[in-house]
């Protein structure tokens, strides 16, 4: 890939500031991976006759190694179609999605949740709602048709969010798929985007119940294990959605005490994994750099004239550059998911993310 744009451009969150090379890379791996059936992760096998082929069990979202990655790769492709009118891969993306997104296939996807209502809770649910919201935001006849086809699965997930997620009494403070705050902010964004005020209120109430009293978070202990999310910054990225600016600034000063007054003490720097990591799990740290970048940038935007803003923006820029330098790896351990994280960062101000 050609050299990256300046950090200011990367953090702008605007697709019109991205060059053709970067746009091309953002579509390459998702388009290939959504049709790549193997390797595939199976969480449990019920008997000697199992597992079914991924394309039989999940006829829409069978690629990308696991269900949630297939879902967010579809989100990434749909978002690019919405934002880039003359996308060079438009025809290929449309043909690929339409080949799988049928009423029969969506019904089969819904059956999986009848069999196991906890399947992909809540990370996969969060990305499915992002996909539905993206289709809702796109003023296009094809998007309307796709949303109508997907709607039974969307409705299933919304119901499960109400009954099986927003009722949780303890948050999972992890840096991987189980992170409660990440799923909550996706639910919150979906609800705001599609105008579901009841869900928006419920998500905000759950966030407040779980996180309002948090204080003195030891962010310097991160990362843990093979994190691809920052528990601290993901929580802050959620609460800046829930609170108004003054409330959020007061909460953040208590949550990350090092940012309350200058000189700002934010003891995190981009993670380095080397040029050619042999351990695929190490690629989680590339995602962590990207996720830290979008969280830091979002928090800085919400703080307005807070004294921590310059330090937050500078740290976000370093993480964005480090993450994007390795996000487009051809190693399938990263290729099946990292482009979605890159797109999330690079288009974070194009609607559907942190929207009020």
PLM feature spans:
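Extended ligand-binding groove/face enriched in aromatic
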Residues: 59, 63-71, 83-194
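Active-site-proximal alpha-helical scaffolds that flank and shape metal-associated catalytic sites
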Residues: 121-125, 174-187, 209, 215-261
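Haloarchaeal acidic low-complexity proteome signature biased toward cell-envelope/secretome components but also
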Residues: 1-21, 93-108, 268-271, 307-314, ...
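Low-complexity, Ser/Thr/Pro/Gly-enriched N-terminal "stalk/linker" regions
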Residues: 1-62, 331
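Long, well-ordered core segments of solenoidal/helical folds
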Residues: 26-39, 51, 92-111, 149-170, ...
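Fungal-biased detection of long, low-complexity, Ser/Thr-
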Residues: 272-356
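Well-ordered alpha-helical scaffold segments within catalytic/enzyme domains
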Residues: 5-18, 74-87, 126-142, 183-195, ...
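Solvent-exposed loop and edge beta-strand segments that line ligand/cofactor-binding
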Residues: 15, 54-71, 110-126, 167-181, ...
């Amino acid at each position: 890939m050609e050299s990256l744009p300046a950090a200011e451009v990367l953090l702008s969150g605007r697709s019109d500031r991205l060059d053709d090379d970067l746009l091309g890379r953002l579509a390459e791996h998702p388009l290939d991976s959504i049709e790549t059936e193997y390797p595939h992760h199976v969480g449990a096998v019920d008997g000697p006759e199992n597992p079914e082929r991924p394309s039989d069990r999940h006829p829409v979202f069978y690629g990308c190694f696991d269900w949630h990655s297939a879902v967010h790769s579809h989100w990434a492709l749909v978002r690019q179609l919405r934002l880039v009118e003359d996308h060079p891969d438009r025809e290929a993306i449309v043909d690929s999605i339409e080949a799988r997104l049928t009423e029969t296939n969506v019904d089969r996807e819904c059956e999986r949740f009848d069999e196991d209502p906890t399947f992909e809770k809540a990370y996969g649910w969060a990305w499915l709602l992002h996909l539905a919201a993206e289709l809702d935001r796109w003023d296009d006849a094809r998007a309307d048709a796709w949303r109508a086809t997907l709607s039974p699965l969307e409705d299933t997930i919304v119901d499960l969010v109400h009954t099986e997620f927003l009722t949780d009494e303890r948050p999972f403070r992890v840096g991987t798929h189980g992170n409660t705050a990440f799923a909550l902010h996706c639910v919150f964004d979906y609800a705001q985007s599609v105008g579901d005020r009841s869900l928006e209120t419920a998500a905000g109430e759950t966030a407040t119940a779980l996180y309002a009293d948090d204080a003195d978070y030891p962010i310097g202990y991160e990362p843990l294990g093979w994190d691809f999310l920052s528990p601290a910054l993901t929580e802050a990225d959620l609460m800046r959605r829930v609170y108004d600016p003054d409330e959020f600034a007061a909460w953040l000063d208590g949550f990350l005490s090092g940012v309350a007054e200058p000189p700002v003490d934010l003891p995190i720097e981009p993670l380095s994994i080397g040029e050619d990591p042999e351990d695929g799990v190490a690629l989680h740290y590339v995602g962590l750099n990207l996720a830290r970048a979008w969280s830091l940038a979002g928090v800085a935007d919400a703080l307005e004239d807070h004294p921590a803003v310059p330090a937050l923006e500078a740290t976000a820029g370093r993480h964005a550059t480090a993450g994007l330098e390795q996000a487009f790896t051809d190693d399938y351990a990263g290729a099946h998911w990292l482009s979605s994280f890159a797109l999330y960062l690079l288009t974070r101000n194009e609607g559907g993310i942190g929207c009020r």
